[in-house]
Amino acid sequence: MGTETLLKIREMGREVKRKRQNEMVDYAYMTAPCGLPCFECYLYLAQFDEEMAETIAGVLGLSKEDTKCKGCRAEDGQCGHLAMECRVYKCIQKTGLQTCAECRDFPCDYLHPYSDQAMKPHNTKVFNLCRIKKVGLEAWAKNEAGGILDKYYYGQWTL
């Protein structure tokens, strides 16, 4: 995906969030068990903007409908854009926990980051879960989640 297209999608997502800023968000429901903020995801936001859905569909080679995700929990862990079943979702369903941050085995291998998936937000899961554990889900969702993704996609690495 080219930088120009990514920036266009980012701006579309910001516009969708601006239009929806007065709507209540159930952050617990809209945070995936693995710590991904579904409420910040471009695939979630695409359901509210047809042009955004078309742009993402073109980039990912998916149907427009498969780009419109309602969130991990609403999709029972099987978002249309994923070809595989989510092991994290299946695991958390068995435990009855809200997120992996609550699990005694956290972090486990299900949360392992992979470089071949670096353009997806999945490499932010462990960091998000650590922040949720430290500041609480609501504070993380309101104050940090969007910034973490922005920094991941658009920030510069520093030591």
Predicted regions and their residues:
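Cysteine-centered metal-binding/redox modules
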Residues: 2-159
